[in-house]
């Protein structure tokens, strides 16, 4: 509380995309509904991209936008999708799905605040060349040194709250400097 922050270790614990779609079909809420999709611990690394595509296919008709979350620090090796080879494959396959299914809702990539400028630039360049709409910046950070209380510096999980503000704003400013066209 002193740091106005939370460290979470939740990951993507849920009942799955089919359960989500069932709930979305029954929703009475009339506001904007965004669906955050991400690989969970049951997703095998070699199938993660296909898992994202399955989720997109199932939810796009029932949501106003989709967030492709590749930046949760609580799912083992998920941030590996930030490397160029994996990122290229993910964006290329999502782009194919968007065109094949004629998806008209925006799809965004949610990025980590811990990535290098080079990685962020690479991602932004790929997004600009695709049918994706933009990025959501940022997820939680693994950098606990942002906390005043040193006893929490070694805790596992994603840090959110006030200590992350400057780091997230730096990422947002950097992304904005790369392209005035990307939301």
Residue ranges and their predicted role:
Residues 1-31:
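A gly/proline- and charged-residue-enriched helix-loop-helix capping module
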